[in-house]
Amino acid sequence: MHLYNYDPAPNPQRLVYFMKLKGLELPTTQIDLGALEQLKPEYQAINASGTVPCLVIDSGEQLTEVIAICQYLELLHPDTPLMGATALEKAQVLEWDHKIFTTLLSAVADMLRNGNPAFEGRALPGPLNLAQIPALVERGQVRIQHCWDVLNTALEGKDFLVGNSVTLADIDLYVAMNFAGWVRERVPETASNLLAFRDRVKALLD
């Protein structure tokens, strides 16, 4: 197997932390997003979507979404389960993963890609050139503040989102919280459950 990634970026970080907790190392090529290497013909010949991560398995087939790569690695290496230990926990991890990705992560991405001049004409990842929509920046701020409230409530009396140990859901939330800093959004001091969660997960991941 061979992994194409860009470790500093939020989406690839989800996989980096997952592999770290699993104790897995894969041959990896870094695709520099800052230099737009993901849009070069050499990489698009590997992954036409022009995104990272991309895992090329031994058969030559590719997995290009974090959730799919994590599921594949989890099935190959079931020790230290990070996607739930029971049927219910597995479903809950997927549910939280989807919620975090479609709410907090996407809200931050909307703010970044629609408000930062570096993404002018590239408001979405990949090869499709789309104009920025400034109104999505303001909407993203509102969505993020709502997410803090929802997530802080969800963590009341809990160390982790699912079960009694860290899972992919916690990794995703931790990455999303840090990603929010890229658009100068911070967890409010009143969200004590979220702040404690961040410290708890940071001690495990960093």
Task: For every predicted segment, state its role.
Residues 1-134:
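GST-like domain detector, emphasizing the conserved glutathione-binding G-site
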Residues 55, 67, 142-147, 206:
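Aromatic-glycine hotspot motif
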Residues 103-202:
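GST-like fold's C-terminal all-alpha helical module
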